[in-house]
Amino acid sequence: MKKHVTWTVQGQIKEGKYDEFLLVMAQLVTLAKSEAGTLMYEWTVSEDKRNVHIYERYQDEDAAKAHLAGWGESGPLFLSVVDMDKVTVFSQLSEEFAQTFAGPSSVFMKPVGGFVKF
């Protein structure tokens, strides 16, 4: 399997914040699109506009770290419109980098098979 780093973020859009959520999402998507090692950054919303899932994939751990380096600025924006429920990591990370995600709402899934064609 490739050394891509993949995770999903799940959360609830704050009551009455959907329009603001869309503006924040657009800002964060624009930022992520400019990152060289960001391969995939897709946001999906439930039909009732209450839940958001974000699928993120990076070229490697360095690219993922570069993306998260902006959390100091982008994190407060995101958290102003979303209550984060869960982060699921689908990659084998270094112990040091895994600590970035450590917490009660984090789940680590160990890759055991499959393939990526891109």
Which positions does each model-derived feature cover?
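Short S/T/G/P-rich N-terminal loop/turn motif that feeds into the first structured element of a domain
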Residues: M1-V52, Q59-G70, S80-F118
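A short, acidic, amphipathic alpha-helical segment used as a generic capping/interface helix at domain edges
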Residues: G72-P76
